[in-house]
Design a protein with these regions (language model features):
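RNA pseudouridine synthases
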Residues: 1-138
């Protein structure tokens, strides 16, 4: 039996979970009224308070190829932080670090990090936080 595979690109909005069901009073992708087949699933995830590209597919081989860490697919994130950022902080971010999650320690891999010029981004609801007395960096 041949099943037609499909892949969709979605700009996941801020405040929406990366799975289709609502949870804890927060809307999931299913609340977006997308006209998608029932057999597609997110390829990875973005946190609820993140926005950006998320792929959806029904091709399990494709999903596995992208998510399997040993395949070495990189990801790029633009992050806004409060306060001035210095080179020492950037270097620390590039290095592996230990994260404690549910009483277990997980070691991150090293990564690339750099300061970016402030991007032009679309308005969103809620607005991106800007405070006059606290600088931000990307």
């Amino acid at each position: 039996m041949n099943v037609e595979t499909s892949c969709y690109a979605l700009n996941k909005p801020f405040g929406v979970l990366s799975h289709f069901t609502d949870e804890g009073g927060h809307p999931g992708l299913g609340s977006l009224s997308l006209d998608l087949p029932k057999d597609v699933y997110p390829v990875g995830r973005l946190d609820r308070d993140s926005e950006g590209l998320i792929l959806l597919s029904n091709d399990s081989s494709f999903i596995h190829e992208l998510l399997e860490p040993s395949n070495g697919h990189s990801r790029t994130y633009m992050v806004q932080v409060e306060g001035d950022v210095n080179s020492g902080q950037i270097e620390a971010l590039k290095s592996p670090m230990d994260l404690r999650i549910k009483k277990q320690v997980h070691r991150t891999k090293s990564c690339e990090a750099k300061l970016l010029p402030t991007p032009v981004v679309e308005d969103r609801i809620p607005p991106i936080r800007e405070r006059k007395s606290i600088p931000t960096n990307w």
